[in-house]
């Protein structure tokens, strides 16, 4: 398989962004065993490919085990992933668990099955990680997934919450990591096409796509077309939170604010401090109708005293 210079730049960018995310969040450490969850989609293929490349030149030693969950969906091409994983030489395990039948039994016809399916799948993944001795679980969510989740939670849940690049499972036994957190979906899709990964379609279960997520995705893509770089800026905002300028009393002690306590940058109270401050304009019966907004000074007490004494003698 021959590739162009553009491909190698793309590959380098994905590896660099993944390596930076791993370093920034301490995702992988020396001696870790990482269970790499493979769905057969572009994201998980890309994640495995990038992690294998980084593993070869990393200054630490860690083990990768690829895992696919065969949920017994009708028509699932169960031969594709084992053949691919053998061809790239990674250790792997195929876990069979008939979650499909459970979902079909519990969810009414025509309703989205993704929520229950993901919960059942998560339980199997955690159990598999425990049995294999894997302390890290790698998922293929990327930057766009994280931003979409942020808006979904804000629009439909009333929370400022996204997908963390790294989190601990509820029982505290495993750490879930998202190595592609800094990577764009566009780059991942381009890489997957160039690598000719044997993609397994994600609609085998017959479930409808999450319509809310689809709408949010379309909204973000429309913003990106109008203002290139918008999604990246939103993701950067998730990494640069200023609690004092939000309204969550659990994150910032608003009730404890008082005069004489310099809690925040005063200038930032009036807006973005990176813009050059413009002179204030005044209209009216004054000598000068233009002044710089720097500070106001009161006359010294000594200068005001004679005037007060004079007034008292009259």
UniProtKB/Swiss-Prot annotation:
Q: Which GO terms describe its biological process?
A: tRNA thio-modification
Location(s) in or outside the cell: Cytoplasm
This protein's record includes keyword Lipid biosynthesis: no
Q: Any note on cofactor binding?
A: Binds 1 [4Fe-4S] cluster per subunit. The cluster is chelated by three Cys residues, the fourth Fe has a free coordination site that may bind a sulfur atom transferred from the persulfide of IscS.
What the entry lists under Pfam families is as follows: ATP_bind_3 (PF01171)
Q: Which InterPro entries match?
A: Rossmann-like_a/b/a_fold, TilS/TtcA_N, tRNA_Cyd_32_2_STrfase
Q: What else is known?
A: The thiolation reaction likely consists of two steps: a first activation step by ATP to form an adenylated intermediate of the target base of tRNA, and a second nucleophilic substitution step of the sulfur (S) atom supplied by the hydrosulfide attached to the Fe-S cluster.
Recorded protein name is: tRNA-cytidine(32) 2-sulfurtransferase
Underlying gene: ttcA
């Amino acid at each position: 398989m021959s590739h162009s210079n553009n491909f190698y730049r793309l590959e380098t960018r994905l590896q660099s962004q993944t390596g930076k995310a791993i370093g920034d969040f301490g995702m992988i450490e020396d001696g870790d065993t990482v269970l790499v969850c493979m769905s057969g989609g572009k994201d998980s293929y890309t994640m495995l490919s990038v992690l294998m490349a980084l593993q070869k030149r990393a200054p630490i030693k860690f083990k990768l085990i690829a895992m696919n969950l065969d949920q017994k969906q009708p028509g699932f091409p169960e031969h594709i992933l084992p053949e691919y994983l053998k061809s790239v030489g990674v250790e792997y395990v195929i876990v069979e668990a008939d979650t499909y039948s459970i979902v079909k039994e519990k969810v009414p016809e025509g309703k989205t099955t993704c929520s229950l399916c993901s919960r059942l799948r998560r339980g199997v993944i955690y159990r598999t990680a425990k049995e294999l001795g894997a302390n890290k679980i790698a998922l293929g969510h990327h930057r766009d997934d994280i931003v979409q989740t942020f808006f979904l939670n804000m629009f439909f849940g009333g929370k400022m919450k996204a997908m963390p690049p790294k989190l601990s499972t509820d029982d505290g036994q495993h750490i879930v990591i998202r190595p592609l957190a800094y990577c764009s979906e566009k780059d991942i899709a381009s890489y997957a096409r160039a690598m000719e990964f044997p993609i397994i379609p994600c609609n085998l279960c017959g479930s409808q796509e999450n319509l809310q997520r689809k709408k949010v995705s379309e909204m973000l893509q429309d913003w990106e077309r109008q203002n290139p770089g918008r999604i990246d800026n939103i993701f950067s905002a998730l990494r640069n939170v200023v609690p004092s300028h939000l309204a969550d009393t659990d994150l910032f002690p608003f009730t404890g604010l008082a005069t004489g306590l310099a809690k925040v940058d005063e200038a930032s109270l009036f807006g973005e401090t990176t813009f050059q401050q413009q002179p204030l304009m005044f209209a009216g019966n004054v000598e000068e109708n233009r002044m710089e907004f720097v500070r106001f000074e009161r006359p010294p007490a000594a200068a005001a005293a004679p005037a007060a004494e004079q007034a008292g003698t009259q």
